[in-house]
Amino acid sequence: FIILVGPSGCGKSTTLRMIAGLEDISKGELYIGDTLANDVAPKDRDIAMVFQNYALYPHMTVYDNMAFGLKLRKFSKEEIKRRVEEAARILGIEQYLDRKPKALSGGQRQRVALGRAIVRNPKVFLLDEPLSNLDAKLRAQMRTEISKIYQRLGTTFIYVTHDQTEAMTMGTRIVVMKDGFIQQVDTPQHLYDMPCNMFVAGFIGSPQMNFINAVLSKNGGKYTLDFDKYHVPVPESKVNADLDNYVGKEVVLGIRPEHVHDEPEEIAKAECLLKANVDVTELMGAEIYLYVNINGTPITARVEPASTAKPGDDIEIAFDLSKLHIFDKDTEKTITN
């Protein structure tokens, strides 16, 4: 289950359209299975595509919408009936087969669009932001539905989205794109834990990673990241041969909000405490987002709901040093393990 993710205009939908044969491939080779597909007509590529808009025929029933492609390919009535009913059962829309699209909700229409693709039994499913027209609750439900379909069918899915939640929860591998270039291809967890550059680090994760300009210092064989009046130790697990090239230079310290703590037990054992002023708090139910600043440097922390911090409070925070990242300030590439 491949996810193409990135901001608007990064080239993810264009890539999908090239796979589908709707755009010319300017360079490189496209293989579908073992077949070189650059010059294969779209109708012969054995792919099925689901778009952001459902593209259902309003005058046809759900059954006829799902069966339409099979009828064009001259399948027998018995085979069409078998495939449509099986897809409807997988998607839980058996009771809607006699209805017209206007009698369905947005989520049901999206299921019909998926069903129309499933009956084709293609080698590859291409999905171009299929959930963006749905409300938040339906999106979450359909994410689960599509993941179940993938597990059941075992077919290749290539899914385009700008929503990193969809990317992280659905994909087995994620392709992060920016300005037409692939930034990183990885599993969701590895992408989250070990981003290759600041763009990936900031794009994956919500709230996004904190970035702090700092100077790398070395004293007695120990490295620290210095900013304001603070000297944040670099743990041994993050040290590599490249670090010496950056001593005395400006770098960027990266730390995710969930690795910034204000809990007393974390403060008590912290190697480095930082004093911060609370600007805003957001109660999310199971957690609180603290928006604080360290002498003007903004930091976001995702803390336990037991936190008593209020806007205007001066508090102490600590970083989970084992989770910090260091980036080259010029190239924005990661320089830590």
Language-model features and meaning:
Residues 26-29, 79, 179, 324:
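Conserved coupling/switch loops of ABC nucleotide-binding domains, chiefly the family-specific signature
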Residues 40-199, 203:
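ABC ATPase nucleotide-binding domains
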Residues 5-7:
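The feature captures the beta-strand-to-loop junction immediately N-terminal to the Walker
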Residues 13-16, 112:
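ABC ATPase nucleotide-binding domain helices that frame the ATP-binding cleft
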Residues 23-24, 31, 71:
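A position-specific signal in ABC ATPase nucleotide-binding domains
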Residues 28-36:
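Conserved ABC transporter NBD signature motif
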Residues 222-278, 298, 308-337:
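Glycine/charge-rich catalytic "coupling/switch" loops of P-loop NTPases
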Residues 20:
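Helix-to-loop junction immediately C-terminal to a conserved catalytic motif
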